[in-house]
Amino acid sequence: MTEELATPTLADVVDAFHTLFPPQLAAGWDASGLVAGRAAAPVHTVLFTVDALAATAEEAIAEGAQLLITHHPLLLRGAQFIPDSTYKGEVLHTLIEGGCGLLGAHTNADAAVEGVNEALCDAIGLIDREPLTEAQTQVLDGQEHAVGTGRIGTLPEEITLKELAERLAAALPPTAGGLRIAGRADQPIRRVALCGGAGDSLFDAVRATDAQVYITADLRHHPASEFRETARVTGSNIALIDCSHPASESLWLRSAADRLRKLLAERGYGIETKLSALNTDPWDFTVPTGVQPGQDAHSASTAAAPAWEL
């Protein structure tokens, strides 16, 4: 006979989630944690998404969720007023009026065991992984794990830069911008550094490794150009792969949902977890430059970016 699982409170769910992704791993400037919700409220369904948007808040209510877990904190940059005439106010009013809490897990989810960066490692098959930055320590199931921002690891066998980019592209959800690559298509790759989300702040850490390519998102012109020129001068020739910011972090959602559900079950609680189907990348389509009207522009994407199936 199977024992029926109890319904957890919001406090129970948050405690379990923070066991997996401890708040103390978050950067000092971050704003991860519970944004809204009554601790004693029962939670039957949790929806996971990268961003807290008006659309994902409405989706949470439509899906019958009592908690929306996002990667990006809604109030990262704070807000003094939250009327529904503002984006952040609209999100919070929608959730609160619909009986749904809001929890953000940002840099703590980046750094943690089986977090954002390790999901990206899994997607391309990296082994022998280590934190890219100075390691923090996370205790999980009685064992200490070295964690931190970014990862560096090894591919089981050498492949070309183009093959690696194609492997990554196949693993990520569709976005209008796709991937941007700096480096020779036939460049051999075995050692890979990566950081989900915006990662140009880790360029110095990448240079200090033996990485042959760095995968990240939101690369700006000047930092990327200086990184590539420095690589040429020093002879390292580290390639770059630039992803969509939310796409690079989205692969973590399924793992986080599965692990939360499993941990709560071990504690005697049952919940349903769902993944958002909404594409939260802000870009809708691209148009290639240097192409005159009427010319073949097969590389252009003129259709709205499709929904994500995570």
Where are the regions a protein language model picked out?
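Hydrophobic structural segments
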Residues: 1-310
